[in-house]
């Protein structure tokens, strides 16, 4: 029996003009976009549509923008009926909305706070991330341990697909790895345009503040399993999910294991909802046999709704 998972991208997928095609052209999507504008303490629609102030790339704005775009697309889609959901890093919050663990309004407040805490904890230039291409996890882990010291660390942060591991930590060590990457055996080491050492143990400094903030919202058991970044398996219990969302701040994203877990459950169709096709590209490198669908635009929504 064929099974479907809906999946959601994380930071890096944002672009100016995102979701503008949905606004005023689809009632369900417009409702989500308007709700975001009414819930947040900044003009999110201006930031998403025109970004005249150049603030879309700041993590406290990027995070609610991506959640809003994915949630608007999700609201516009008919007859989805997924068996599972999964998101990459920030995208996991879109999966929580999809599975009704959090209301959209609560989720958008949470990711705004998550971004603010991340930005405050690490002023620009302290921490960073880079993608290591052409090495397996064990080798990357070994390199990270050899570069780290008592006062500076670098760690695997996103285990994305075979031959692509993202590392995170102090910028000085990220820069060193970028410089030495080829001599250490990597095909390439590419610095990422992010403002902090996300998914590394350095993020533990915000654990307490974030945990106490998210406790004030209503969390519900998931309507269908959410495959979590931290443990790469489906969860439905609200307390387990909430605890894992705190751990997610400072733990690696287990994307390969999560995808393989879903395939083991019988999933043969992944539907990526949100800007870009990054996750579809990763999944193709994990398993070439599964079906991949990308829903990014109003046209994609219309195509799905007409055909399904």
From Swiss-Prot:
SUPFAM superfamilies: FabD/lysophospholipase-like, Probable ACP-binding domain of malonyl-CoA ACP transacylase. GO terms for biological process: fatty acid biosynthetic process. The active site is at residues 89, 199. Keywords: Acyltransferase, Fatty acid biosynthesis, Fatty acid metabolism, Lipid biosynthesis, Lipid metabolism, Transferase. It comes from the Bacteria. Pathway: Lipid metabolism; fatty acid biosynthesis. The keyword ATP-binding does not apply. Pfam families: Acyl_transf_1. Its EC number is 2.3.1.39. One of its GO terms (cellular component) is cytosol. GO terms for molecular function: [acyl-carrier-protein] S-malonyltransferase activity. It is an enzyme of class 2 (transferase). It catalyses: holo-[ACP] + malonyl-CoA = malonyl-[ACP] + CoA. Belongs to the FabD family. This is Malonyl CoA-acyl carrier protein transacylase. It comes from Staphylococcus aureus (strain MRSA252). The gene is fabD.
